[in-house]
A protein has these predicted regions:
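Bacterial lipoprotein signal-peptidase II cleavage site
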Residues: 27-36
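Early extracytoplasmic/lumenal segment of secretory-pathway proteins
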Residues: 41-137
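Conserved C-terminal helix/tail region of periplasmic/extracytoplasmic solute-binding proteins
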Residues: 43, 376-411
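Extracytoplasmic ligand-binding site segments that recognize negatively charged/polar headgroups
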Residues: 72-87, 106-115, 127-274
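A ligand-binding cleft/hinge motif common to bilobed small-molecule-binding domains
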Residues: 140-142, 271, 277-294
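Periplasmic-binding protein-like
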Residues: 162, 167, 180-181, 245-251, ...
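A bilobed periplasmic-binding-protein/Venus flytrap-type ligand-binding module shared by bacterial periplasmic
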Residues: 184-191, 228-230, 307-322, 338-342
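Mature extracytoplasmic/periplasmic domains
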Residues: 313-382
Length: 411
């Protein structure tokens, strides 16, 4: 989801982050096996293999096809810099392929909506309403299970695939555009200095001063994975997760003023002083801090379960060439680290979410170079210090306990 930054004194966050992180190996995640595509055609000199359509095209043919497609629809999150992102992509296509295209960039904090629409279109024999989905990894895994995901890797239109570590790829069906995203708690370190663990949200001093995620999607899911770890519960067992929900509702519930994942609401409540803490994505702490709210701090869970964004192309996408162009652009170092875009530092910190591989390390901007590793892990830490999630198990059981959570809070 929409990611933003954590905030503590320089150099202290990195130490806190990784002192608490559970070292359990690389971020390879358990996920359903992708269905194989047809054998790739053999292209001659001067041609590029274009996946999804499985055709060979010259550069001129690619340009003509992009002009013919004319645009694409991407399902993502609610970045504050979405308008700039749209403009930058459209300018890139014009400069690279000579075509004027329209990027429709949809945003939501409830990405399950995308799968619902894709499944309905597939069942009805209709074209997919999206050309690219760019949300958390668990939705890709669910999409594969439902038969909604196209094979598209490798493709000559996506040379930037080679820049991304294997642990962030599920070829042939998806590739990460984030490496360090996870749900956490953003809090005011002056008003709530006692917050050290997720269980500390039960402190009576926070009565009426926090928000928790609304049930149903990965923001709530990620929060409860972290809380389950603190309570010694197994997130793969729905009965144990219901116990985690019961604990949260009983102990944290009296402090909750609202259950929501609406980002503008969360930020308005926090910035006005109406709340002292909210459960949302780690990047929001960065956004608050760089926006001038220097007391905004990230509570890092003792066990970090990453929920990174992954790019994939739905079956039935009607603009498959532009979909691949967008994915390649999104993976480029210049977009992963949008240093030349006309955006504020807080917006930059939303769009950039860690290194995908060694070729990205040199792109940290000068204005952030001295403090970058106070807010982000090193590439080696990214490779080794996050706990992978069994998304098959999560997807198989989460609806049961998420529905239970909804019932317990009256939603």
């Amino acid at each position: 989801m929409h990611r933003n930054n954590r905030v503590t004194a320089p150099r202290t966050i990195a130490a806190l982050f990784f002192a608490l992180a559970l070292v359990v190996g690389a971020c390879n995640t358990a996920a359903p096996a992708a269905s194989g595509g047809g054998a790739a055609v053999t292209c001659t000199d001067g041609q590029k293999h274009v996946s999804v359509t499985n055709t060979c095209m010259t550069d001129d043919q690619i340009k003509a096809e992009i002009a013919k497609e004319g645009g694409l629809v991407v399902g993502n999150w609610t970045y504050s810099a979405n308008a700039v992102l749209i403009d930058e992509f459209q300018k890139y296509v014009k400069a690279t392929y000579g075509a004027d295209v329209k990027l429709t960039y949809e945003g939501t904090q409830a990405p399950s909506e995308y799968l619902t629409k894709l499944a309905a279109a597939s069942k009805g024999g209709n074209p997919a309403p999206y050309d690219v989905i760019a949300v958390e990894e668990n939705y890709w895994a669910d999409g594969v299970t439902q038969g909604l995901v196209s094979d598209f890797l490798p493709s000559d239109l996506i040379p930037n695939q080679k820049l991304v570590l294997d642990q962030f790829q599920h070829a042939p069906t998806s590739i990460a555009f984030q490496s360090t995203a996870f749900p956490g708690v953003v809090y005011n370190k002056t008003k709530a200095p006692f917050l050290k663990t997720l269980k500390d949200l039960a402190n009576p001093a926070l009565k009426g001063k926090i928000t928790l995620p609304a049930p149903g999607d990965i923001t709530a899911g990620g929060f409860f994975l972290g809380l389950a770890s603190e309570l010694g519960k197994d997130y793969k067992d729905p009965a144990q997760m219901k116990e985690v929900v019961d604990w949260a509702v009983t102990n944290i519930g009296p402090n909750v003023v609202q259950y929501t994942t609406d980002q503008p609401t969360l930020q308005q409540l926090f910035e006005s002083g109406a709340i002292d803490a909210f459960a949302f994505w780690n990047s929001t702490a960065r956004l608050e801090y760089f926006g001038g709210h220097k007391d905004a701090t990230l509570l890092v869970p003792g066990t970090i379960y990453p929920a990174n964004g992954y790019l994939w192309i739905p079956k039935g996408a009607t603009h498959p060439v532009l979909a691949q162009v967008f994915i390649n652009w999104r993976l480029s170092p210049e977009v992963q680290f949008p240093n030349d875009w006309p955006i504020e530092h807080g917006q930059w910190s939303e769009l950039s979410e860690g290194f995908l591989g060694p070729d990205y390390v040199s792109h940290v901007p000068d204005w952030f170079a001295a403090d970058y590793f106070s807010y982000f892990p090193t590439l080696d830490q990214i490779k080794t210090q996050f706990k992978p999630v069994d998304w098959n198990a999560y997807n198989a059981t989460s609806k049961e306990w998420q529905d239970y959570y909804a019932t317990k809070i009256g939603q």
